[in-house]
């Protein structure tokens, strides 16, 4: 084979291989079959092997996997070359031939590149047809496959721009056109990546082909010059079309990758959800075991472990049953005897006997052994985008929700509705009803959950405060649903009733050891949770506290007040010996519970305060004057305030200097005072106003006027 034949043969091999890989992108063939299924490539491979006389020729030229030089230099090892020009240098070639081999492919070879449809370029090698061709040639021209050379050439402007930006980066970095220092390699690499990412953006610059001038086009009288401009522009259009198709292909690849990542994320989210469901199940089982142990201890039903043999086990089981039956009989006798004995006592003595039993139960309930600590807390809500609706519970009550509270994300939710005397308990993970608390005689205004003891405190318009055992309430409700026990159960989920207020309870705050309540009777009372006693009473019947910003006659009873009436004490919160109250006159007062005196007043609201929350640094208040104000507790000064188009009905502390706000609108507003911006959680198409809200650990629950409850990630 002559030198020219070798050159031609190598050129055809390169062209055929490149075309095969380009066509592979538009076919569904397997990657391993790209070359083996290509006819022209197989023919060239066969000719190469035949011209080599025998495959053993290649093995003879190798030693330990590398080609060995010989005196004739007829076969070269490309791995042993230090310069690219030495690869094809031998006794048959010179420097010019090597340069041609490395840099030039003739138009004839480009025109012979096979395509998927078996089409070839025009004989003159033009990229686009011009005037004079028939319509079929025009259609075929648009269907031609892009060659590897055309793809390289179309990206030359982008490559030049990349080189220019890299040189500019190096110059801007160290003031010269040299290379970047080794210590700055990582940072400079990141900067280069950002520049390369922005390379395809041609919004600010339009590339005009060299040799084409717009002024000459409008003033030229030379047909040859105009035809030359036309050909250049046609070629440029073809190059731009190649770039566009390649970019579209990259976009499609990115979309596929994004979809794959989205599906992978959904699978991982489902996995985390299952894990947290299992954690909640195990937590519930642990709680049931603890409750069962307490039950056995309370009724004296503990049985010594039996021996390992069957007889001993049977004896133990029979003994357990006997003890249980005796305990039940004794309990029945005791209950009957107490009832008969109490019936013979005077009314005041009967009430005292009931109070003593209730106090004993309260003290036993708040013993240290009753305190529960969760082993794990849900974090699934943190994986949602802020403002994402997680779920909803429809029609929890017939009228608007007056208050709600929950213990933890995806945990237990308690709700109360207007003119509804019961509290309903819901499972936030399954979004179904799991319990009910009946005992109040009027609408329930406020509530708070203590998740350490599994309790709920409620305050209603019947002037009563009630402490509930949520775990027992759920067990009784489940037994009632399954009809596994009589309906006249001895136990009651109401652990204790705090009775001292003479008018409706409008606000409360639950501390680890104390309960603080505010009422329409213009008093604030502090209660001991272990004894049930009222430790102190703070009277708010002093000047200008309850006389402004209202037209309501306070001399009348408010047990049947209207829903829009301003409460005397709209909100309060306590922590240790600190107490903050918001009253009808729009003034926030900070109290020291040890002395029962006001230590600071915060004035700024012009109407009754409806809600407040504080932490170690700031205090957030909402009012009927349609504003939310954030106060600095250290200085007592107003930091920021934000105005709304409707009265603020409820709020909760989102984070420092930020709050979740309900302003009698269909959306919940999240106000960030540091950034001085507000964004909302709104459900499209739902025009029902929000009446109350609670937030904990990136998890928000809001109640609406139609009784619906929505759950959000924020």
UniProtKB/Swiss-Prot annotation:
Asked if the record carries the keyword Ligase, the reply is no
Q: Which residues carry this modification: Phosphoserine?
A: 376
Alphabetized CDD domains for the sequence = Mdv1_N, WD40
What is one Pfam family matched by this protein?
WD40
Q: Does the keyword Lipid metabolism apply?
A: no
InterPro entries, per database record: G-protein_beta_WD-40_rep, Mt_division_protein_1, WD40/YVTN_repeat-like_dom_sf, WD40_repeat_CS, WD40_repeat_dom_sf, WD40_rpt, WD_repeat_multifunction
UniProt KW keywords: Coiled coil, Membrane, Mitochondrion, Mitochondrion outer membrane, Phosphoprotein, Repeat, WD repeat
Q: Which residues form a coiled coil?
A: 240-298
Q: What is its main location?
A: mitochondrion
Q: How does it sit in the membrane?
A: Peripheral membrane protein
Q: Where is the composition biased (Polar residues)?
A: 332-343
Q: Where in the cell is it found?
A: Mitochondrion outer membrane
Positions of the UniProt region annotated as Disordered: 323-354
* Any Gene Ontology CC annotation: mitochondrial outer membrane
WD repeat positions: 396-436, 439-478, 500-539, 561-603, 604-642, 644-681, 685-714
According to its UniProt record, which protein family does this protein belong to? Belongs to the WD repeat MDV1/CAF4 family.
Explain the purpose of this protein. Involved in mitochondrial fission. Has a partially redundant function to CAF4 in acting as an adapter protein, binding to FIS1 on the mitochondrial outer membrane and recruiting the dynamin-like GTPase DNM1 to form mitochondrial fission complexes. Formation of these complexes is required to promote constriction and fission of the mitochondrial compartment at a late step in mitochondrial division.
Instruction: State whether it acts alone or in a complex, and with which partners, per the record.
Output: Interacts with CAF4, DNM1 and FIS1, components of the mitochondrial fission machinery. Interacts via its N-terminal, coiled-coil extension (NTE) with FIS1, and via its WD repeats with DNM1.
Would you tell me the protein name for this molecule? Answer: Mitochondrial division protein 1
